[in-house]
């Protein structure tokens, strides 16, 4: 029976840190289950891309990295209930033997369920962060070098930068509306 590892992320967007981590994961197990977290979320500043877009990014990036197709992509909608989250994930994915994560809460939740947890190396977390990449997109700063070439091309194909800028503008306008004084109409 092949040894399977679980790796969960939101991938908003897929970046070079994800790929470096996945290269490590692939080197440790026979098959990898890649859980796509917050699968229900899209078109928000924190989660701008749809699940299918994130799946496409992963497929292209893993192919570009030369990683064998020894993986499953599984969407994982949020349940916002940490105490049972690891049980929920276990019910949503094929059998796995080990969990790879850089998130201390994820590590704790799976250890409590008796799983082996390996904290994979983190790569340039200061800039290889989806939050930083989205921020750079909004501010018009260079971001392409932080993601695989195939992901940068895909984001451009779907006009992802324009979407993120629009979401940021909408959020900024909403915040201004919330801070505006309330005017009671005169009758």
UniProtKB/Swiss-Prot annotation:
Instruction: List keywords of the entry alphabetically.
Output: ATP-binding, Cytoplasm, NAD, Nucleotide-binding, Nucleotidyltransferase, Pyridine nucleotide biosynthesis, Transferase
Is Transferase there in the keyword field?
Answer: yes
Gene Ontology BP terms: NAD biosynthetic process
* Signal peptide span: none
Q: Which SUPFAM superfamilies match?
A: Nucleotidylyl transferase
Q: Which domain of life is it from?
A: Archaea
A single GO CC term for this protein reads:
cytoplasm
**Reactions mediated catalytically:** beta-nicotinamide D-ribonucleotide + ATP + H(+) = diphosphate + NAD(+)
Named in its record, the pathway it takes part in is: Cofactor biosynthesis; NAD(+) biosynthesis; NAD(+) from nicotinamide D-ribonucleotide: step 1/1
Q: What is its EC number?
A: 2.7.7.1
Q: Under the GO molecular function aspect, what terms does this record hold?
A: ATP binding; nicotinamide-nucleotide adenylyltransferase activity
InterPro entries the UniProt entry points to? Cyt_trans-like, NMN_Atrans_arc, Rossmann-like_a/b/a_fold
Say yes or no: keyword ATP-binding present. yes
Q: Where in the cell is it found?
A: Cytoplasm
NCBIfam families xrefs: arch_NMN_Atrans, cyt_tran_rel, PRK01153.1
| Name of the featured protein | Nicotinamide-nucleotide adenylyltransferase
Q: Which organism is it from?
A: Thermococcus onnurineus (strain NA1)
């Amino acid at each position: 029976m092949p040894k399977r590892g679980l790796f969960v992320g939101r991938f908003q967007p897929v970046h070079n840190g994800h790929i470096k981590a996945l290269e490590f994961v692939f080197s440790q197990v026979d098959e990898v289950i890649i859980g796509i977290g917050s699968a229900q979320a899209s078109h928000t500043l924190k989660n701008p891309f749809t699940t299918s877009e994130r799946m496409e990014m992963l497929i292209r990036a893993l192919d570009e990295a030369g990683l064998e197709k020894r993986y499953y992509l599984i969407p994982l909608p949020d349940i916002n209930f940490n105490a049972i989250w690891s049980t929920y994930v276990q019910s949503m994915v094929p059998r796995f033997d080990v969990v790879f994560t850089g998130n201390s809460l994820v590590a704790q939740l799976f250890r409590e369920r008796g799983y082996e947890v390996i904290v994979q190396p983190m790569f340039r977390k200061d800039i290889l962060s989806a939050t930083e990449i989205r921020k750079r997109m909004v501010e018009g700063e260079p971001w392409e070098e932080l993601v695989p070439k195939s992901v940068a091309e895909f984001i451009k194909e779907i006009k992802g930068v324009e979407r993120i800028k629009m979401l940021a503008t909408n959020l900024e306008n909403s915040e201004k509306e919330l801070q505006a004084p309330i005017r009671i109409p005169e009758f």
